[in-house]
Amino acid sequence: VRSLASVPNEARVLVVDAESTDATASLARERGARVVVWPWAGFVATRRYALALVDGPWTFMLDADESLDATLRVALAALEPPDDVDAYAIPRTTYFCGSPIRYGTWGADAPVRLFRTQRATLVAEPAAGGSAELHERWSVPGHVGSINGTLVHDSYPTFASYRAKFARYTSLEAAGMRGSAPALARAIAVAALRAPWYLIVRSGWRDGWRGAFLAFSSAAYPMVVAWKAWRRA
């Protein structure tokens, strides 16, 4: 609901609902959105399917746990894209347990979310050396511009929500990998180097205990993936 409420009233909204069992679809329809129900086929496939349904010249891709701040809404309303700009990178701030994370591995984040519909391609980026398509980025042939405002990403309101997503994503990535003891050993070594890098060099400590926790958990992520893949081998 927060995500839809943040969208400008004049925008045409398309919601692709992966057969949710809560009130997501009905709430979206009440707010005037076009709702298309489509069986879940993975993150990348779902985004590509959604883009294929768009008939406007520009698309703003918004996840259910994201919302636009007031500055971004004003900037979008006044935007007049030059002909050579095919997309805009949107600064994004992720919240963890109620506070914004401004440093560390989550600090510098500005994904491409606004783009010319017919010029954008979604590129899958398998993580941790596996084949699972969990991460992606929008690619365009032209220039990528910048815009004022912030995309608010409130995906982890509690430790439980973070832990659940961490467990889910690492399991999905491990399922697309061939595990081995050498791969696990390399992942452990990399994790030991990344933790202080995220904490000190990337200034994760500036975010307090949240930054310290995320520095170590982010560093451990590939190691957990490798461990789960090794257990499956």
Kindly give the residue locations of the regions a language model identified.
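Cofactor-binding loops of NAD(P)H-dependent oxidoreductases
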Residues: W38, L62-A64
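Acidic helix N-cap motif at the loop->helix transition within catalytic regions
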Residues: V1, D22-R31, T71-L72
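A conserved acidic beta->alpha catalytic loop
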Residues: S6, D17-L27, D63
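Short, well-formed alpha-helical segments that are part of the catalytic scaffolds
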Residues: V1-N9
